[in-house]
Amino acid sequence: MKLPIYLDYSATTPVDPRVAQKMCECLTMEGNFGNPASRSHVFGWKAEEAVENARRQVAELVNADPREIVWTSGATESDNLAIKGVAHFNASKGKHIITSKIEHKAVLDTTRQLEREGFEVTYLEPGEDGLITPAMVAAALREDTILVSVMHVNNEIGTVNDIAAIGELTRSRGVLYHVDAAQSTGKVAIDLERMKVDLMSFSAHKTYGPKGIGALYVRRKPRVRLEAQMHGGGHERGMRSGTLATHQIVGMGEAFRIAREEMAAESRRIAGLSHRFHEQVSTLEEVYLNGSATARVPHNLNLSFNYVEGESLIMSLRDLAVSSGSACTSASLEPSYVLRALGRNDELAHSSIRFTFGRFTTEEEVDYAARKVCEAVGKLRELSPLWDMYKDGVDLSKIEWQAH
């Protein structure tokens, strides 16, 4: 077993060696290095063939038509293209958008920008379980609503929204529905032939592919129209200009092919590891699971260790790569906005750690990690006067603290 142990698979995944091999074949003079847009010679034709094969592989994972897959630089760009693209194209029909308070920042910062441009955005509060229900969406719909953006799997707490049910509702009301699915590919089955989802964002690097490449699913029937956010050359049917990065696209295709073939077995294995880890750390007192216990992906365990500072705990777990909050916001010392939206108090939100397991996690690593967590929490609580008071039966919620 090698240290440190990587348990932050929701931040990024290592590239699968099979993916890396395919990517290396598209870089050098001996490989498939051509520009897919070069129509006048065999180098371009071969590159285009590789790109279209990858487009098919991405489409197959989610049961879509390959023509509905648009290459982007990642899920952040896909979210921007979907939300701004729909908002700008449909601004004459209405200027109201619905999303949730626990979306990824790529969605929330995009809707904030649209608010500055004169759009109105409703931010739905999740339940304590971290779920956004169709009823919540229905209550917020208005005559001038043009778009709903509610994610599939939450990046911090791993909860899984019922996007099929939300899609039924939005389609019946003639409102477009965008889903950020960066965290769900390879973890949850997605069938876009059956689901009434209009736009869906994907990322390669959350699914053992390379960073810097993603895709946006844009439904053809009924047809979804977008305003491009990137201009120059008219690539990707005018929706996203820029020379296609063959090696990254081929990597994403191969990663999604592997995900499709191995998803069921991998999820079963990871569910076992996650359960094993949770059972061991649950021998500690005052450990809380954040988010629904049932509607969640097995890969994610977001736990709060009461009376322990999350940042101190991370410092104590030097041999474990884990995070507090998502990688995109964990540099800020504010408690997680996702946990606060769930109604967690600041103390519990501050004491949360996200453990995320993946393809290369082993039982030995999980046992070692659980042991280290139990030791670290025990030591930190020994130093905590609040823990002593709790053990003495003091109700800390009733104490009025004096400001100095």
Swiss-Prot record:
Disruption phenotype: Essential, it cannot be deleted. Keywords: 2Fe-2S, Cytoplasm, Iron, Iron-sulfur, Metal-binding, Pyridoxal phosphate, Transferase, tRNA processing. It catalyses: (sulfur carrier)-H + L-cysteine = (sulfur carrier)-SH + L-alanine. The active site is at residue 328. SUPFAM superfamilies: PLP-dependent transferases. Its EC number is 2.8.1.7. Pathway: Cofactor biosynthesis; iron-sulfur cluster biosynthesis. GO terms for cellular component: L-cysteine desulfurase complex. Pyridoxal 5'-phosphate binds at residues 75-76, 155, 183, 203-205, 243. Inhibited by equimolar N-iodoacetyl-N'-(5-sulfo-1-naphthyl)ethylenediamine. GO terms for biological process: [2Fe-2S] cluster assembly; tRNA processing. The modification N6-(pyridoxal phosphate)lysine is found at residue 206. It is found in: Cytoplasm. Its cofactor is pyridoxal 5'-phosphate. NCBIfam families: IscS, PRK14012.1. Master enzyme that delivers sulfur to a number of partners involved in Fe-S cluster assembly, tRNA modification or cofactor biosynthesis. Catalyzes the removal of elemental sulfur from cysteine to produce alanine via an enzyme-bound persulfide intermediate. Functions as a sulfur delivery protein for Fe-S cluster synthesis. Cluster assembly on IscU homodimers proceeds sequentially from 1 2Fe-2S per dimer, to 2 2Fe-2S per dimer and finally 1 4Fe-4S per dimer. Belongs to the class-V pyridoxal-phosphate-dependent aminotransferase family. NifS/IscS subfamily. This is Cysteine desulfurase IscS. It comes from Azotobacter vinelandii. The lineage of its organism: Bacteria, Pseudomonadati, Pseudomonadota, Gammaproteobacteria, Pseudomonadales.
